[in-house]
């Protein structure tokens, strides 16, 4: 038995622990933390006024993952879903499903549900999709701790894949030189992303969008993107936008890189071309303004209007082909919501979102982009 960042919850003599693995025959339960379209999927029992995460007992001879799938289908009516194993949990102490109080083990899973049948074949009365977790839990000393573990694992996963993108940009900065083809830069970036842990690329299977010179003002969907035959010049401007993923966990990271006299200039203050320098300084200013302006209550639309006004006030234009400035990070590409007009959702209602202003001076042939992923914790806005 291997310890997995052991965490405990005590109260009424209950203790919750987490492990990476245990012997398979010890696993008697499966619990499936579930979401659908960004909402928590909670079950209400016919005989209770409380809510619970779907889950249940393993049947004789049943594979534990099949237990998870079966319980999910029976208790939520899920018919189309993606499910993944997270870790093993255990509960020690007497409770409604463990009369002797000995340590019992279960598999903790996560499921993204895409379609429900509308029928429940179990003791559940109904399924409720919630923006916020319930206050009236059926198992208040157990399931909130399982949710907390899921969120911790999720954050680690997103941080790791985003770090892969950051390391790839740092790597490519060291080897970019005049004479390199954009296609070769794309190939090197994508190979590095895979080497560092990505298993695929979430945006139309393109891992690295690479633009140079007057192409840096181009804003195009990945569906139409084709890497040009441009070659890096002795003095050049290059924008690289990365979209790695592992499983269905996304990274999203972009930077505009300046080459002067054949060398990458990493310090904005040392850039000699004043237009390029001003463009990158404005990107820094925009991200600083993001921290100043937003709260969890800020809507995507409010951020859209504020930042577009801020861009214009500072003498720039927004180049994005859709006019937006970023999007939520989700597990299904079609579920993204955008920093755009009409989006009344609050930033605090999504787990993560990108901020990626693509800007230029009016009528200039050069564009600039800086993209990070952000989220809120108890202290406020944080860069992932």
Give, region by region, the residue ranges found by the protein language model:
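Short helix-loop capping/hinge motifs at secondary-structure junctions, enriched
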Residues: 40, 115-120, 264-265
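Unchanged
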Residues: 59-84, 89-149
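Short glycine-rich loop/turn motifs
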Residues: 29-31, 40, 206-208
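Active-site neighborhoods and metal-handling regions in enzymes and metal-associated proteins
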Residues: 153-384
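Conserved Nudix-box catalytic region and its N-terminal flanking loop in Nudix hydrolases
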Residues: 35-74
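Acidic, metal-coordinating catalytic segment for phosphate/diphosphate chemistry
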Residues: 1-31
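Short beta-strand scaffold segments in enzyme catalytic cores
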Residues: 30-34, 374-375
């Amino acid at each position: 038995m291997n310890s997995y960042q052991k965490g405990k919850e005590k109260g009424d003599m209950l203790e919750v622990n987490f492990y990476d693995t245990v012997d398979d025959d010890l696993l008697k339960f499966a619990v499936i933390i579930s979401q659908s379209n960004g909402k928590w999927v909670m079950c209400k029992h016919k005989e209770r006024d409380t809510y619970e995460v779907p889950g249940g007992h393993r049947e004789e001879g049943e594979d534990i993952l099949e237990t998870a799938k079966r319980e999910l289908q029976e208790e939520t009516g899920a018919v189309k879903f993606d499910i993944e194993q997270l870790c093993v949990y255990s509960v020690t102490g007497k409770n409604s499903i463990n009369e002797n109080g000995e340590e019992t083990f279960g598999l903790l899973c996560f499921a993204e549900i895409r379609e429900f049948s509308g029928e429940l074949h179990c003791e559940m009365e109904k399924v409720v999709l919630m923006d916020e977790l319930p206050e009236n839990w059926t198992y208040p000393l157990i399931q909130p701790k399982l949710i907390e573990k899921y969120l911790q694992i999720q954050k680690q996963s997103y941080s790791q894949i985003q770090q892969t993108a950051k390391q790839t940009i740092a790597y490519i900065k060291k080897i970019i030189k005049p004479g390199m083809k954009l296609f070769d830069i794309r190939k090197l970036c994508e190979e590095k992303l895979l080497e560092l842990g990505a298993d695929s690329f979430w945006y139309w299977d393109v891992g690295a969008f690479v633009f140079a010179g007057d192409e840096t003002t181009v804003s195009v969907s990945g569906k139409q993107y084709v890497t040009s035959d441009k070659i890096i010049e002795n003095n050049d401007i290059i924008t690289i936008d990365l979209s790695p993923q592992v499983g269905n966990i996304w990274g999203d990271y972009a930077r505009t890189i300046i080459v002067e006299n054949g060398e990458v200039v990493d310090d904005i203050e040392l850039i000699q071309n004043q237009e390029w320098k001003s463009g990158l300084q404005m990107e820094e200013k925009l991200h600083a303004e993001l921290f100043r302006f937003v709260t969890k209550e800020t809507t995507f639309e409010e951020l859209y209007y504020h930042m577009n006004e801020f861009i214009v006030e500072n003498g720039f234009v927004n180049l994005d082909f859709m006019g937006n400035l970023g999007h939520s990070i989700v597990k299904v590409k079609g579920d993204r919501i955008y920093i755009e007009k009409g989006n009344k959702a609050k930033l605090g209602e999504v787990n993560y979102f990108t901020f990626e202003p693509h800007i230029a001076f009016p009528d200039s042939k050069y564009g600039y982009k800086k993209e990070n992923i952000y989220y809120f914790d108890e202290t406020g806005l944080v860069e992932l």
